[in-house]
A protein has these predicted regions:
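Extracellular/periplasmic metallocenter environments
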Residues: 59, 63, 77-88, 99
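N-terminal pre-ligand scaffold of iron-sulfur
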Residues: 1-61, 65-70, 103-147
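Short proline/glycine-enriched turn/loop segments at secondary-structure junctions
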Residues: 91-97, 103-104
Length: 147
């Protein structure tokens, strides 16, 4: 779809856009974090970030549960075993072996194409390009014990 429509969907979702056809979450990626992102991410994931979006597969890399957004914390929080990820899918806590997995992204002429045939492993534990901490209460209790 159109990049403007994708951004509008994210804003309507309180910072989280879910695209069921792609089985993907899309969030806004802050331009101020791009220097750090360029050291961690490669194309075609970086292409989305350079166009202001992060695209993550809906499944937790721990055991494959669908990871919902948590409006109060501003993070993704897995209800199965408590893994937590910041708004751009970088691991913050829990048993997951890495951040949320990614899809390749192309943005051409204002059109966004999510390549669901190109699934890439999420970032390593400890990657936090945006510095986003929890913005409020967590939706899943007991998460701190899994660090």
């Amino acid at each position: 779809g159109k990049l403007d429509d994708v951004i509008a969907t994210i804003k309507q979702g309180g910072g989280f856009g879910y695209f069921p056809n792609a089985r993907a979450w899309v969030t806004q990626y802050p331009s101020a974090a791009l220097p750090k992102a360029r050291k961690v991410y490669a194309q075609p994931v970086l292409n989305g970030m350079e166009n202001g979006i992060a695209v993550m597969w809906q499944k937790c890399p721990h055991l494959g549960c669908r990871v919902p957004s948590c409006q109060s914390s501003g993070w993704f929080e897995c209800p199965c075993h408590g893994s937590q990820y910041n708004r751009v899918g970088e691991k913050k806590g829990g048993p997951a072996p890495r951040g949320m997995d990614r899809f390749g992204v192309e943005v051409n002429g204002g059109n966004v194409v999510i390549n669901t045939g190109l699934q890439l492993n999420g970032p390593a534990i400890g990657v936090n390009t945006t510095g986003q901490e929890a913005e409020g209460p967590h939706c899943i209790s007991g998460e701190a014990s899994h660090n």
